[in-house]
């Protein structure tokens, strides 16, 4: 169990993109308390063969709108005043379970089945004072060059283009869910280098309106990939994924996509 008090200051100077709830000019302050619970019983941080990894966190800002005597329902309230102190409560969970298909004590290069689920919600105390920051950008390989995504949280979903689920058109989400199943097999499992291939099936979605959150309305994909871990370089990877669904009502299905991995896994 860990607790931390965090402060982030944002300053926008003639920000031309419609990224943050029409917030283009001014400053914003984020003061929040984060509480986090983690449990990790995995046997290897690189190529995990058995164990589980669970985490749950909540971040809370003071509910300024309850006591600052501002009418946030007034559309004439200046944007800079509306977001001078941003407020939210943000909840996130994640869990991974690794199951070896052979006994790791006798078979070093055992295939491993990994199941994962994660999700998050960022909500407001006042519906007229939603946070423009900390929202979710979903789809692709988390290596997008989208404007403003350093102020948002990027969630990968293979088989779909970067930001096609949420964020590509500044339609950032306030909730998301993702579930994955991977079958991994190590080609090389040594201290100097670890290489493994994988097949995956996953599904996820993100919603701008929290009331539309539906864990059964997910965008599905499947594919194959390879990972290489070298101590002096870090984690490298390449995936091919096929998205079976339409990211939204007016686009084509995800289709065939290539994804790159650098530093952190999808």
Language-model-derived ranges and their functions:
Residues 1-2, 43-46, 102-105, 188-191, ...:
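Repeated loop/turn-to-beta-strand initiation elements of outer-membrane beta-barrel proteins
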Residues 1-23:
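Transmembrane beta-barrel wall of Gram-negative outer-membrane proteins
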Residues 16-187, 199, 207-209, 260-265:
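C-terminal outer-membrane beta-barrel translocator/porin domains of Gram-negative envelope proteins
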Residues 104-105, 213-215, 247-252:
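Short proline/glycine-enriched turn/loop segments at secondary-structure junctions
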Residues 158, 204-221:
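Outer-membrane beta-barrel transmembrane domain signature
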Residues 117, 121, 229-266:
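Predominantly the C-terminal beta-signal and adjacent terminal strand-loop region
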Residues 184, 221-227:
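Short glycine-rich, acidic/polar surface loops and turns
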Residues 174, 193-194:
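Hydrophobic alpha-helical transmembrane segments and adjacent short intramembrane/lumenal linkers
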């Amino acid at each position: 169990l860990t607790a931390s008090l965090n402060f982030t200051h944002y300053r926008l100077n003639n920000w031309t993109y419609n990224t943050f709830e029409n917030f283009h000019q001014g400053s914003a302050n984020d003061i929040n308390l984060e509480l986090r619970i983690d449990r990790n019983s995995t046997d290897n941080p690189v190529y995990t063969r058995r164990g589980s990894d669970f985490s749950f966190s909540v971040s809370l800002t003071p509910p300024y709108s309850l006591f600052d005597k501002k009418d946030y329902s007034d559309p004439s309230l200046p944007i800079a005043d509306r977001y001078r102190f941003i407020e939210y409560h943000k909840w996130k969970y994640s869990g991974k379970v690794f199951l070896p298909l052979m006994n790791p004590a006798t078979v070093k290069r055992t295939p491993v089945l990994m199941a994962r689920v994660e999700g998050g919600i960022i909500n407001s105390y006042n519906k007229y004072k939603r946070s423009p920051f900390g929202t979710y950008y979903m789809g692709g390989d988390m290596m997008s060059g989208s404007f403003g995504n350093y102020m948002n949280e990027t969630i990968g979903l293979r088989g779909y283009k970067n930001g096609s689920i949420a964020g590509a058109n500044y339609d950032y989400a306030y909730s998301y869910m993702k579930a994955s199943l991977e079958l991994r097999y190590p080609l090389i499992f040594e201290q100097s280098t670890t290489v493994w291939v994988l097949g995956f099936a996953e599904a996820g979605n993100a919603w701008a309106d929290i009331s539309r959150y539906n864990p059964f309305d997910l965008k599905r994909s499947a594919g194959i990939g390879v990972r290489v871990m070298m101590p002096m370089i870090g984690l490298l990877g390449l995936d091919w994924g096929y998205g079976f669904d339409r990211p939204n009502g007016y686009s084509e299905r995800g289709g065939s996509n290539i994804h790159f991995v650098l530093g952190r896994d999808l």
